[in-house]
Amino acid sequence: MGGTVNRLVQQGHDVHVAYETSGNIAVGDEEVTRFMHFINGFNQLFADESDQVIKRKYEEIKTFLANKKQGDSDTRDILTIKGLIRRGEARTACTYNHIPLDHVHFLDLPFYESGKIEKLPMSEMDVNIVRKLISDVKPHQIYVAGDLADPHGTHRKCTDAVLAAIDMEKEAGAEWLKDCRVWMYRGAWAEWEIENIEMCVPMSPEELRAKRNSILKHQSQMESAPFLGDDERLFWQRAEDRNRATASLYDKLGLACYEAMEAFVEYKP
């Protein structure tokens, strides 16, 4: 939904972006090595190697990764670094789309922090974290991932946490919900069936290119990403192909012809 985010910003809306999970297990070890080389080099160049914490951690992590075997779990330090890499990429993408950094929220939901592909069960703690954010922001629109085809189930749990938080706010009689609509989009694995689509946001060639540029800010999720799935296309290629296919379907139905379209289904709590 990168095109929709860009459109909302251009129209002057107060846009907030919430990253529900750290995304740390979806970062390859070579990304950690690259960033550790950088920070160690920075320490050598500008601090005369005076930061002993950096030196010690650099050696610890380098040794661990050199001896890591397939199936070994990452240490908490490495998972933290991988999460930090994802945060940096997210901030870069948001800055590219003119979203202020104080409108970028990293929730780090606990269910994700198992350090493994299989996540922990979603708990009340996860829901309360999401609830606090939405009750503070009081949005007029909420966009959530309806990616039920996600092979790892993370998107489903993230969406469930948001919907559970909305239900709790509704039960509490939150007035802001009366002016709020919830839209579900799909990501890398599937698109909504055309008969179920309730809103489409068209994109020009320039807007589609801007969406691609935003995706490319997430460098750790390109060629070497651990969980690309069976589809050999990169995430930006999948997104463009799917958005163009949606626009083509509407063109064949006799509607206006656009370069691409993002599709949404409304969730009614």
Each model region followed by its residue ranges:
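Short conserved active-site loop signatures built around small residues
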Residues: 1
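Metal-dependent de-N-acetylase/amidase catalytic core
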Residues: 4-20, 24-61, 67-269
